[in-house]
Design a protein with these regions (language model features):
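Conserved pre-ATP/AMP-binding loop-to-beta segment of ANL
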Residues: 21-24, 147-165, 171-172, 198-209
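Gly/Ser/Thr-rich phosphate-binding loop
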Residues: 254-258, 266-328, 341
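Conserved structural elements of the adenylate-forming
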Residues: 45-53, 157, 176-202
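Conserved AMP-binding/adenylate-forming
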Residues: 39, 52-98, 212-213
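Conserved AMP-binding/adenylation subdomain of ANL enzymes
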Residues: 184-209, 216-257, 261-273, 280
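Conserved AMP-binding A3 loop
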Residues: 38-42, 161-188
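AMP-binding/adenylate-forming catalytic core of the ANL superfamily
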Residues: 115, 344, 354, 359-360, ...
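N-lobe entry segment of adenylate-forming
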Residues: 1-58, 63, 82
Length: 489
């Protein structure tokens, strides 16, 4: 059994410095030298102590002050994460690929005491320097400091610990406030995933590594800095998705968190007999979106242990986990965790209650009240149904519903899943066009007729009220927000 901890202090002083001190914590591939660097937990913890010393020495009265990380995945990112928290600061994760309009809004909202950046230009370097030059800091500032001898206990269990921004598709992003209690309540679910892998392999001493290509401002990657230290396992951190095949061979990885586009790429390798390209990978953890059940079933029947996690930034990524590998249930998001409460509203909206629910949206009590009711239920905005075996299946997003004059409700995600099965379709968005259900399709110009024919055939299988009667084409990728989600407006 893996021991579940409930605070950052113990994670570093017990797990990193004692239980797993001789195990590898993090690996990085350096394209320039073609070398892999492996860092053991004891050395990782020593650098975390340096970071604590650095922040406490250079930011007076740091308790509660906002410190932003604005950079790509790196070892320094991981070290500063724990250093900021243990020193008493509030860690703010920012997406370096956002526009200056979005970044300046988020920076202005949190009013940071410091912004750590790697110095690379992601398109906003000049504006960042002009507006915040006096508080910009390099990522490796901690290296010049001696490790703090006595690790401080600065964090209240229910204090604000981390600020992460949602990736809204219809308006400004919101700052999600997460506490230590929020974060560590989720560790039970992540430890359970580890134990299920042990059961699957019939090996209670199983030690694995996870490859992460997702950016650290993405909760699915970031939370692994905490969860994998529970089992003394390693994170293999990608520097560039373009080096995927080389990195996953040079840094043997059994587990990988995936979004649909990555899962589809892995699926092609498996189905075309190129599984060896994936090295030791056997556990894709699917999160952040709805996945094609057939793709997951294909992976499961070809030796992969497919895990799905359902959650939101507002639930600290917690929610429901699905371990089912059978055709009937692999398309579900799971049966629910025993430490959370669930209910379906009359309109089908899924609601969740428990310790992982956020403190609220930063400086936005009105928006908080819209999603967390007086009884503590978080309204996910996702529509779902529950089958006779207790499995929850997502059916769409409440705010995306198209409501026809006839009163019928249309889930665009359902129709997008149908259109997306056409091989010529690269991306698509279903929306209301006047009084019609329409679809915007990104595909090659010479494939447009193929797509029209596919939609015509698909419509014949649908009820009249669900049929797509307007089709528009784009020869360019469809617009997305800073987190890569398709915009629907």
């Amino acid at each position: 059994m893996i021991k579940v901890l409930d605070n950052v202090y113990d994670l570093v002083t017990l797990n990193m410095e004692q239980r797993f001190s001789e195990r590898v914590a993090l690996r990085f591939y350096d394209k320039e030298t073609d070398e892999v660097t492996a860092v053991h937990y004891k050395d990782y913890a020593r650098d975390i102590r340096r970071a604590v010393s650095y922040f406490q020495s250079t930011i007076p009265d740091i308790k509660g002050k906002k410190i932003c990380l604005l950079n790509k995945n790196s070892y320094e990112y991981a070290v500063n994460t724990f250093g900021i928290i243990l020193a008493g600061g509030v860690l703010v994760l920012l997406n370096q690929h956002k526009s200056w309009d979005e970044l300046s809004y988020e920076l202005g909202l949190v009013d940071p005491a410091a912004v750590l950046t790697d110095g690379d230009d992601y398109g906003t370097k000049e504006q960042l320097q002009a507006a915040y030059g006096s508080i910009l800091r390099p990522m490796d500032g901690f290296r010049a400091y001696e490790p703090v001898a006595e690790m401080p206990r600065c964090i209240g269990h229910d204090d604000l610990m981390i600020l992460m921004f949602t990736s809204g598709t219809t308006g400004r992003s919101k700052g999600v406030m997460l506490s230590e209690r929020n974060f560590f309540s989720v560790m039970r679910a992540h430890v359970q995933i580890g134990e299920r892998m042990m059961e699957y392999k019939h090996d209670p001493e199983l030690v694995v590594s996870q490859y992460t290509v997702l950016p650290m401002f993405h909760l699915g990657a970031f939370i692994c800095l905490f969860s994998w230290a529970h089992g003394g396992w390693a994170l293999n951190i990608s520097g560039d998705i373009r080096n995927f095949y080389k990195e996953i061979r040079r840094m043997p990885s059994q587990v990988m968190a995936v979004v649909p586009v990555i899962m589809n790429s892995l699926h092609k390798d498996v189905m075309r007999g190129r599984k060896e390209r994936l090295g030791e990978l056997w556990v894709p953890i699917c999160s952040s979106a709805m996945f094609d059940p057939q793709v997951m079933l294909d992976m499961a029947t070809n030796g992969m242990f497919v895990v799905q996690t359902y959650g939101a930034t507002e639930t600290c990524g917690d929610g429901i986990i699905n371990y089912a590998q059978d055709a009937k249930h692999i398309g579900a998001v799971g049966q629910g965790n025993d430490y959370l409460d669930y209910k379906l509203e009359p309109d089908g909206e899924l609601c969740i209650r428990g310790d992982s629910i956020m403190l609220g949206y930063y400086k936005d009590p009105e928006a908080t009240a819209e999603v967390i009711d007086a009884d503590g239920w978080f309204h996910t905005g996702d529509l779902a149904r529950k089958d006779e075996d207790g499995y929850y299946f997502l059916t769409g997003r409440k705010k995306n519903l198209i409501i026809l004059d006839s009163g019928e409700n249309i889930s665009p995600e359902e129709l997008e899943g149908i259109v997306g099965k056409c091989e010529a379709v690269k991306e698509c968005v279903v929306k209301e066009m006047g009084k019609k259900i329409g679809v915007v399709v990104y595909c090659d110009e010479d494939k447009q007729q193929q797509v029209r024919d596919f939609i015509t055939e698909a419509n014949r299988t649908l009820p009249l009220y669900k049929r797509m009667s307007a089709v528009e084409f784009s020869t360019e990728p469809l617009p997305r927000n800073g987190a890569g989600k398709l915009l629907r407006q």
